[in-house]
Design a protein with these regions (language model features):
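Anionic-ligand anchoring segments at beta-strand to alpha-helix junctions in alpha/beta enzyme folds, i.e.
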Residues: 16-75
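Short alpha-helices
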Residues: 110-178
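Active-site cofactor/cluster-binding pocket
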Residues: 70-119
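Glycine-rich, Lys/Arg-enriched anion-binding loops that position phosphate/diphosphate groups
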Residues: 163-234, 242, 246-247
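Gly/His-enriched, cation/cofactor- and phosphate-binding structural elements
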Residues: 5, 12-17, 22, 30, ...
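Secretory targeting signatures
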Residues: 1-4, 10, 29-32, 162
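Hydrophobic/aromatic beta-strand patches that form the interior of the parallel beta-sheet core
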Residues: 51, 87, 106-110, 123-125, ...
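Divalent metal-coordination and catalytic microenvironments
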Residues: 26, 36, 65, 111, ...
């Protein structure tokens, strides 16, 4: 039985499905959720809810939700225990990068990030793929689910934002998947999405990252300072990769009560996920791919409530920078 057929066998025993996106969902996660919703409805699942934790702060991601009219519900307003089945898309582990408690076992998991098995009834994790959307496009093709303009547009944009717009190792599968959905996509919507990339807050954060950058060889560390926009960190990291001679970037910043990390690398010798794990695993939750990774460290490890923001960032920055360069074996 194919993986798509196995997925259908689980859905056919389900009347209600909660599709859980990871915190602060990006287009790959959201488009994958839409694809699973389409497959579920095509196989007579009566109630489908797409839920997420965190916030959608990235201007482009907000435009993605609004232009494609994606119906979402926050996890705080979703009683997932009342659904027959719970699905994770673009993430695998409860309690990690999701507000879902660690003691909840999902019934369906589809992801392209490496991770430990969670004993779901259906689990399809392909870390050799460049995007979760690619996996769902293969499902849609095999199951002959009607591809609406809305879904095709969402999937095509997700493929571009996750892989095809970057040097970060898109696989042949991403190009083939893009060709499959391209004829049904609305290119005007994609143009509008590309025109909504940066909010003023994100531009300010990128400016702080540029000003604070510290470089050793082809590697660079920068701070966005204190920001309310989690998505500003990966955007700043992507931007700094454009600096001549730089191939590896770590951006950090304080978001709420945590220090957020976002790493990017186009150096084939650097595994960013392993590098962050080596440098920061004992401090918080970190991990990711060969070319992109992230993490979250509780601010309480470094600070008291009364600490001055500027002094705190200087204190934290020095330690994070040293740990990152040490993990890359880069001397002063």
């Amino acid at each position: 039985m194919s993986r798509a057929a196995e997925l259908v066998s689980v859905l056919e025993a389900t009347d209600s499905l909660a599709i859980v996106c990871h915190d602060n969902p990006d287009p790959d996660c959201l488009a994958s959720a839409l694809a699973l919703e389409a497959i579920a409805r095509d196989h007579d699942v009566e109630e489908v809810t797409i839920a997420y934790g965190g916030e959608i702060s990235h201007q482009q991601n907000r435009a993605f939700v609004n232009l494609l009219e994606i119906s979402l519900r926050t996890l705080s307003r979703t009683a997932i225990e009342e659904y027959d089945s719970v699905s994770f898309v673009d993430h695998t582990r409860p309690g990690a990068n999701t507000e879902v408690p660690a003691d909840v076992t999902p019934d369906i998991v589809v992801d392209h990030h490496p991770g430990e098995s969670v004993d779901a009834a259906f689990e399809d994790v392909r870390d050799e793929y460049g995007a979760t959307a690619t996996i769902f496009i293969e499902y849609l093709q095999e199951l002959e689910v009607d591809l609406t303009t809305r879904l095709a547009s969402a999937l095509l944009f997700a493929l571009h934002r996750e892989r095809l717009d970057f040097v970060r190792e898109p696989t042949r599968r991403e190009y083939e998947a893009a060709l499959a959905v391209y004829p049904d996509a609305d290119l005007e919507i994609l143009e509008q999405l590309y025109g909504s990339a940066f909010s003023p807050g994100t531009l300010d954060a990128i400016g702080r990252a540029i000003a604070s950058r510290e470089r050793r060889g082809s590697s660079l560390v920068a701070s966005v300072g204190k920001t309310g926009e989690t998505d500003a960190l990966p955007q700043a990291a992507d931007y700094l990769l454009n600096l001549e001679g730089v191939d590896t970037v770590l951006v950090y910043g304080v978001v709420g009560d945590a220090i957020r990390l976002s790493g990017r690398s186009i150096d084939p010798r650097v595994h960013m996920g392993e590098t962050l794990a080596e440098g920061f695993d004992e401090l918080g939750a970190v991990g990711g791919h060969h070319d992109m990774a992230g993490g979250r460290i509780e601010l309480g490890l470094f600070a008291d409530d009364d600490d001055d923001d500027g002094a705190l960032l200087e204190f934290v920055g020095g330690r994070l920078t040293r740990r990152f360069f040490d993990a890359l074996n880069l001397d002063d």
